[in-house]
Amino acid sequence: MESSSSTFLTTTSLDKKKPSPVSRKSPKQKKKTTSTNKPIKVRYISNPMRVQTCASKFRELVQELTGQDAVDLQPEPIYSPSSDDHNLSPPAENLAPRVLHQEPFGERDSDCYEPLNAEDMFLPDQMSAGFSGFFSNGFYNVNDFGSIDSM
């Protein structure tokens, strides 16, 4: 093989038996870009509005509201406590107490809601039957161990 300034690789094609040289190019270096871009203008919207538009007008509406030609909004004043803030109160109509109209339980509801009895809730027979279902996978049986007193 001859040596030269560029690197050659030999590959064999399936159709041909002769090796063919393939040149390997050095990776391209990235060009450094100068920062000639203008700074990004960030716009915070404190009081958003709802608009309706169709799909074809959506892009135009977004450009109108946020693009270069968008009208700059007046910045809101920074919060500072003043005497006006202490006098703020919600409208009187919102202060009226709300009464929920609930009917007491009727006879038809009492069939669904029976009072709980503690004796009915914790019967040992029901509890042991319930727990044995957890252990019935064949590895061991709870009843094979016998009682605790026999150990």
Swiss-Prot record:
Pfam family membership, one: VQ
Keywords attached to this entry: Chloroplast, Nucleus, Plant defense, Plastid, Transit peptide
One example of a Gene Ontology biological process annotation: positive regulation of DNA-binding transcription factor activity
UniProt transit peptide range: 1-54
Motif interval(s): Bipartite nuclear localization signal: 16-32
Compartment(s) where it occurs, according to its Swiss-Prot or TrEMBL record: Plastid, Chloroplast; Nucleus
Tissue: Expressed in leaves and roots, but not in flowers.
Name of this protein: Sigma factor binding protein 1, chloroplastic
Organism, as annotated: Arabidopsis thaliana
Motif position, VQ: 58-67
Family matches, as InterPro entries: SIB1/2 (IPR039335), VQ (IPR008889)
Gene induction: By light. Accumulates in response to infection with the bacterial pathogen Pseudomonas syringae. Induced by infection with the necrotrophic fungal pathogen B.cinerea.
Cellular component, GO annotation: chloroplast; nucleus
